[in-house]
Swiss-Prot record:
The gene is RPS4. This is Small ribosomal subunit protein eS4. GO terms for biological process: translation. PROSITE patterns: S4. The lineage of its organism: Eukaryota, Fungi, Fungi incertae sedis, Microsporidia, Unikaryonidae. Component of the small ribosomal subunit.
Amino acid sequence: MPTGHRDHLKRKTAPKSWMLDKQGGTFALMPASGPHKKTECIPLGYLISRFLRYASNFKELSIILAEKNIKVNGRVRTNSHFPVGLFDVVSIEKTGEHFRVLYNVHKKFHLHRISSEEASYRLTKVTKKYENQGIPYIVSSCGLSIRFCDPAIDLGYTIKISNETSKVIEYIVPGPDKVIFVSRGKARGRVGVINTISTQGKETVYGMTDFAGNTFSCTSKSCILIGESSENIWITLPKERGIRQSELEKINAQLGEMIDTEVAEVSE
């Protein structure tokens, strides 16, 4: 049976992070080839129509994009299939709005409103480092190749990239007390401060504590650094600040603290 690139995507097999309803049709937008993996991105058309609700049908969406009103990381994008991933900045020229693409604590995509100053940069992780004809290169998780970079930058570092010049502004070195954002796995969308760093086989495991005091862990491949410390975070976070509540905590937040349900010992 012939195999190759698929041009169509069924709605049932689309990533759950897109939050598509099952009865909205048979097919979904297929992300185009671009800077992000197809399992870790969302088409630009869904951000405009389903998240921002600026378009109610494909015709309106096409008009908005054709008028070059939408920018992603400072560049005009007119393709509704363009893949937008974690920490990318979506800007709307006519309204002056800027949004950063994040995951919420339920592992779904979320558009977080940011200021124009914060919209001037994005964060990405260094995944490759090599040298070609004496020129040092680094490759980021968003597919960007940068040459003549600081030789101190190594694999696993987080770099802040200017959306205007595509040059490295700053970088973060992994270590204790650094703030990370989990981008993969069961803890996707959670934010925590690194407490311990251990090695299990070939994997580096971070033990972390979130801003509510809950502890969890993830591998270094599943997260990205977003701050030097809890007081120095490079991006603004949604109101839940990456804290995932348990079912009991959700009920307590809605109905108030529950009474003590411990069973008292019955004396005969």
